[in-house]
Amino acid sequence: MTVPATRNDLMIVNMGPHHPSMHGVLRLIVTLDGEDVIDCEPILGYLHRGMEKIAENRTIIQYLPYVTRWDYLATMFTEAITVNAPEELGNIQVPRRASYIRVIMLELSRIASHLLWLGPFMADIGAQTPFFYIFRERELLYDLFETATGMRMMHNFFRIGGVAADLPHGWIDKCLDFCDYFLPEVAEYQKLITRNPIFLERVEGVGFIAEEEAINWGLSGPMLRASGIPWDLRKVDHYECYDEFDWEVQWQKEGDSLARYLVRISEMIESVKIIQQALEGIPGGPYENLEARRFDRVRNIEWNDFEYRFISKKPSPTFELSKQELYVRVEAPKGELGIFLIGDNSVFPWRWKIRPPGLINLQILPQLVKRMKLADIMTILGSIDIIMGEVDR
Amino acid sequence: MDNQSIFQYSLETFPKKWVHLMERSEHGNRFDTNTDYLFKLLYFLKFHTYTRVQVLIDICGVDYPSRKRRFEVVYNLLSTRYNSRIRVQTSADEVTRISSVVSLFPSAGWWEREVWDMFGVSFINHPDLRRILTDYGFEGHPLRKDFPLSGYVEVRYDDPEKRVVSEPIEMTQEFRYFDSASPWEQRSDG
């Protein structure tokens, strides 16, 4: 009887474009030696839709519905950066009320994105329960977005110079209710997950990125902050009206997957703080009060002033982009989302380059998995938090 | 230190022949350089104590078909130490090869692959220069201005052959161009 010989050569395994978790269509070609990973090669391009070329043939207002399809979980950020680019090009001031509404929407979107990062991350590790909990919270966010913008996910809400419509009656109270409801929920997640020994075994020490490496590889967002660099564009760039709120940059020193998890959880709590402050301090207050003041018998000029306006739905469709180049950026939940815009004295941009945080953060993956086991690939991939919609555009 | 001082300092410090154009504006400062000096300039910016531009944010290709050197490759850089950003641009034509900056900034790996894939500008010393976003076996460089928006081929699954095939594009509707800039009402018969 012949004894089958054990082969020692390396195995090349394809983790094909379809994934059970919600990362999107990413193909990983993994070279394995038994259970150890020797190399991993990501192959992108399965979701490439030519967003940049389409942008060269659309006006800004025509292009807005496309942008939410880049990062389809944190849609307000893509819209914010699409309107920030022409606003900076044309030096357009945004009214304070519109800026507050934008900040509220952006922070709600950040919470939504981190929630939908948490669910699949835990599902990859093996814990199925948080997946249902996060969708329960996300549904509440969808309800808020739907009443304010008309759509659950692909909002098309931001306009050049402000937002498309003012907040409806009672929205501010509903949003404050959501914030009060959400904080104990995050505490529940932390009770369930953070000190769970199985979770810690899977996640602690996995995928370590040193500080120097993080800077060299151009990482941004929670990946950078988890490696000990408190770099947050909201504090550094002073954009929108983040300076008027009292909040801290969340960062950790360890640089492993656990640190990234902690950064994102604390960012969610910090976002709730910002939203609560914004809702209480919004110029004009809730829409019903603003309306009443505008229609007051003694017509006070102040309540019709620039600062209390949002922008209406119809800015000029022939908004011309002057012949300049600029790079705008925003602190998306995944990292630094940027647009490099070259205008052309016409309604169409000459070059619209999208700088997705996911592409850069994904590039470090082959290096991180080199000494790890096969099961750690999914943990690391999950902790990087990528969305193929923006990686591939 | 802000944008202006890092810009001013670097202008005064490195050899003048490295940049042939500089521009400062409130939207960001930029250096235009030659492909020969590109690597040296980026090396200087990255390692010099008072510029320390350690983060490569973006490498972008731009196509200006009316120019002789039609492509422009833009490097967006950031210094976290001094919180300032700077742009370095070089021009190239279809056959010029630019030296790769992967040894300086590892994040340039995929960006340069994308510039190669989308524009056709190739890079010397790049460890792995191949297509990144387009389909396997795709021909052409999509983001060039002479490549049409709809492309040249369309793909479909062919049941007899049991695989995906590429065929020349078939437009069932004539291309309609709507001039957004003009206030006149557009009619389909022109």
From Swiss-Prot, chain A:
- In short, the EC number is 7.1.1.-
Q: Pfam families attached here?
A: Complex1_49kDa
Q: Name one GO molecular function term.
A: NAD binding
Cellular compartments annotated: Plastid, Chloroplast thylakoid membrane
What is catalysed by this protein? Answer: a plastoquinone + NADH + (n+1) H(+)(in) = a plastoquinol + NAD(+) + n H(+)(out); a plastoquinone + NADPH + (n+1) H(+)(in) = a plastoquinol + NADP(+) + n H(+)(out)
Q: Name the PROSITE patterns on file.
A: COMPLEX1_49K (PS00535)
The protein, known as: NAD(P)H-quinone oxidoreductase subunit H, chloroplastic
User: From which source organism is this entry?
Assistant: Amborella trichopoda
Q: Which gene codes for it?
A: ndhH
